[in-house]
Regions:
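Glycine/tyrosine- and acidic-biased, solvent-exposed loop/turn segments at the edges of beta-strands
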Residues: 1-94
Length: 94
């Protein structure tokens, strides 16, 4: 179980609701969100830039990157794609 943490401005660093974990930037915008089961990141996770713009989408299995990961540039275009297996990169495409 994650301990409750706050930024100095009182904004929560993260919040749990069921098995969903949401991390926040100090400005209150969402930094990352996904499933957190048995103290591990699982399934699809979405990461954002501090502006709120989509940055990365990827999957975890047992707290390790697994499957496709897609990173977006600041113009919302795919910057590159990677495929992971048990935390190790097995393929990268630009």
């Amino acid at each position: 179980m994650l301990k409750k943490k706050l930024y100095t401005n009182g904004q929560p660093v993260h919040e749990m609701a069921g098995d969903k974990l949401v991390y926040y930037f100090k400005n209150g915008k969402i930094k990352a969100e996904g499933q957190y089961i048995n103290d591990m990141m699982e399934g699809e996770w979405i990461f954002y830039r501090e502006t709120g713009q989509l940055w990365v989408i990827g999957n975890f299995r047992n707290n390790k990157k697994n499957g496709p990961w897609i990173r977006y540039d600041r113009n919302d275009r795919i910057e590159y794609q990677e495929t992971f297996e048990n935390g190790r990169i097995i393929k990268k495409m630009k």
